[in-house]
């Protein structure tokens, strides 16, 4: 799949499907499909643990439709170019500033993603802080003057397409800002399906030091490919607690509420500790 050189390139739903589906849609369909909502902090090892868990169920990871925002972002050539340029001007103390460029990319409605302005503002921010402190976020000044859908919106379009074709789905996400995302964003689309899904929410956890080491390794690999998707190591503690809190909120809600089409029996909640590789069914 070629890179998205502008947001125009990403507007084709077939391009999104091609990224999410490793096989033809018909090969991913099921009369009794699963939706695996895979949550956890970045670098916790969600993909590896989900693959192992599915294999134990007699299912294969590649036979699922993989809904992932990061998989779309990695196709955005302006994002890759910008983050790599900025990365070379950062230190370990302010590498988290790359998150600002990531957020600008996924929310942008501008045909060129408006990344140059973001890049310049972040470099200025680094210089003002002496390279050691993160200043407060600046306000966006780029007008959203095109009717194009953002990458976040395109992810949901791709998700909806998979649901309407009742394919087995893995929805890979980090529950940080929106702790109620499963109820407010994911389930309304699942409920559109012509067939009923079995929903399994998997929270992958690990010790903080282990996650930081994995992120550093992942960053080295990304740098070799001329781009980087960064998480500030100092934010790991907060991300771990946010995902665990969101998991418990969803578990409490879905295991105690009858929503009509979907009942508590249609949901399963599983914790996987990737520090010890011990699975905990809770």
Show where each model-derived region lies:
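N-terminal pre-Walker A segment at the start of P-loop NTPase domains
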Residues: 2-27
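Glycine-rich phosphate-binding loop used to anchor ATP phosphates in small-molecule kinases
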Residues: 143-194
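Hydrophobic positions on the alpha1 helix immediately C-terminal to the Walker A/P-loop
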Residues: 49
């Amino acid at each position: 799949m070629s890179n998205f050189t502008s947001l125009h390139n990403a507007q084709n739903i077939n391009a999104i499907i091609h990224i999410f589906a490793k096989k033809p849609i018909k090969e991913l369909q099921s009369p009794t499909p699963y939706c695996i909502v895979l949550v956890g902090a970045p670098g916790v090892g969600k993909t590896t643990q989900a693959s192992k868990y599915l294999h134990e169920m007699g299912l294969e990871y590649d036979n699922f439709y993989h809904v992932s925002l990061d998989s779309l972002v990695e196709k955005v050539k302006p994002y890759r170019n910008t983050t790599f340029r900025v990365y070379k001007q950062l230190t370990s103390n302010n590498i988290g500033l790359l998150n600002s460029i990531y957020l600008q990319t996924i929310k942008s409605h501008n045909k060129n993603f408006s990344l140059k302005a973001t890049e310049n503002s972040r470099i200025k921010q680094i210089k003002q802080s002496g390279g050691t402190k993160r200043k407060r976020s600046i306000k966006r000044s780029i007008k959203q003057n095109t009717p194009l859908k953002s990458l976040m919106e395109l992810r949901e379009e791709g998700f909806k397409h998979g649901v309407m074709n009742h394919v087995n789905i893995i929805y890979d996400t980090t529950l940080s800002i929106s702790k109620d995302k499963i109820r407010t964003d994911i389930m309304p689309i699942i409920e559109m399906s012509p067939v009923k899904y079995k929903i399994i929410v998997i929270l992958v956890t690990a010790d903080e030091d282990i996650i930081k080491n994995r992120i550093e390794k992942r960053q080295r690999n990304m740098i070799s490919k001329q781009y980087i998707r960064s998480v500030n190591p100092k934010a790991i503690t907060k991300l771990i607690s946010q995902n665990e809190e969101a998991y418990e909120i969803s578990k409490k809600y879905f295991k105690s509420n009858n929503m009509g089409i979907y009942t508590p029996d249609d949901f399963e909640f599983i914790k996987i500790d990737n520090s010890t590789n011990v699975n905990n069914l809770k």
